[in-house]
C-alpha cells in the first residue's frame, strides 16, 4: 500500500524546520509523497498573522524544488475551522488505497485529547511523531488514553531545529533577517507583501 505523509499547519510563515521534518519523515517511513496542508483556521490557535492565501502561496514557494512535496488547498477551500478528522475522512474517501501518515510534533500530539474526534482520527490515520526540542512527551499517559497509537505510530528523532514561526515573526517585526531560516523565495514574498511588520 502506498504511504503518503500529511503535514498540516498554519505555516505563518513556513520555515526550514517544517521542510526538514517533512523530508525526515519521508525518508524514514518510505513515503512516496508529503502533502503540505495549510489550515484556514486552526481550532486551537486564535490568531493568524497573514491570510490563508498568503500562507498557501508561501508554502508553494517553499516546496517548489522538491518533487516529493506537494500542497493541498483542501482546508483553505473549506474555510472556517479546520478539523484534522474532516481532512483525513475526505482524503480516505477520495483515495482509499493510500495509507495516510500525519506528521506531527510531539508538542502537538500532547494535546491530542483536545482534538475534535481524536479517537476516530487515530483509527483512520497513522502518526509520524517528531520529537520537539525542549519538550518531553508523556508517552505512557498518551497510550493510556489512545492505546491504538502503539500500533499506528512511529516516533522519529529527526533533525532537532529549534525554530518557530513565532520567533520568525518577532525577528521580522524587529527588522532582523530571516535569511537561512526560511527559503529565499519565502523571504522575498514576505518582503514584497510586507508581512509581519509591527
Curated annotation (Swiss-Prot):
Gene3D superfamilies the UniProt entry points to: HUPs (3.40.50.620)
Enzyme class: transferase
A GO BP annotation: NAD biosynthetic process
Domain of life: Bacteria
Molecular-function annotations in GO: ATP binding; nicotinate-nucleotide adenylyltransferase activity
Xref: SUPFAM superfamilies: Nucleotidylyl transferase
Pathway(s) the chain acts in: Cofactor biosynthesis; NAD(+) biosynthesis; deamido-NAD(+) from nicotinate D-ribonucleotide: step 1/1
Protein keywords: ATP-binding, NAD, Nucleotide-binding, Nucleotidyltransferase, Pyridine nucleotide biosynthesis, Transferase
Catalytic activity, EC: 2.7.7.18
Catalytic reaction equation(s): nicotinate beta-D-ribonucleotide + ATP + H(+) = deamido-NAD(+) + diphosphate
Keyword Oxidoreductase: no
Pfam families with a match to the protein in the record: CTP_transf_like
Family assignment from sequence similarity: Belongs to the NadD family.
HAMAP family: NaMN_adenylyltr
Function statement: Catalyzes the reversible adenylation of nicotinate mononucleotide (NaMN) to nicotinic acid adenine dinucleotide (NaAD).
Protein name: Probable nicotinate-nucleotide adenylyltransferase
Organism for this UniProt entry: Herpetosiphon aurantiacus (strain ATCC 23779 / DSM 785 / 114-95)
Amino acid at each position: 500500500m502506498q504511504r503518503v505523509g500529511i503535514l498540516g499547519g498554519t505555516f505563518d510563515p513556513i520555515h526550514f524546520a517544517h521542510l526538514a521534518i517533512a523530508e525526515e519523515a519521508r525518508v524514514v517511513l518510505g513515503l512516496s509523497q508529503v502533502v503540505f496542508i495549510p489550515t484556514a483556521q486552526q481550532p486551537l490557535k486564535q490568531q493568524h498573522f497573514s491570510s490563508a492565501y498568503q500562507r498557501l502561496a508561501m508554502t508553494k514557494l517553499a516546496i517548489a524544488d522538491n518533487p516529493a512535496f506537494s500542497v493541498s488547498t483542501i482546508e483553505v477551500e473549506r474555510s472556517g475551522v479546520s478539523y484534522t478528522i474532516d481532512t483525513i475522512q475526505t482524503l480516505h474517501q477520495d483515495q482509499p488505497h493510500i495509507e495516510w501518515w500525519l506528521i506531527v510534533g510531539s508538542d502537538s500530539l500532547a494535546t491530542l485529547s483536545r482534538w475534535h474526534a481524536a479517537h476516530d482520527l487515530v483509527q483512520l490515520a497513522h502518526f509520524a511523531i517528531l520529537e520537539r526540542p525542549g519538550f518531553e512527551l508523556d508517552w505512557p499517559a498518551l497510550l493510556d488514553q489512545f492505546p491504538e497509537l502503539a500500533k499506528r505510530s512511529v516516533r522519529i528523532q529527526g533533525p532537532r531545529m529549534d525554530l518557530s514561526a513565532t520567533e520568525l515573526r518577532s525577528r521580522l517585526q524587529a527588522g532582523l533577517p530571516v535569511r537561512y531560516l526560511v527559503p529565499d523565495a519565502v523571504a522575498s514574498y514576505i518582503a514584497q507583501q510586507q508581512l509581519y511588520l509591527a
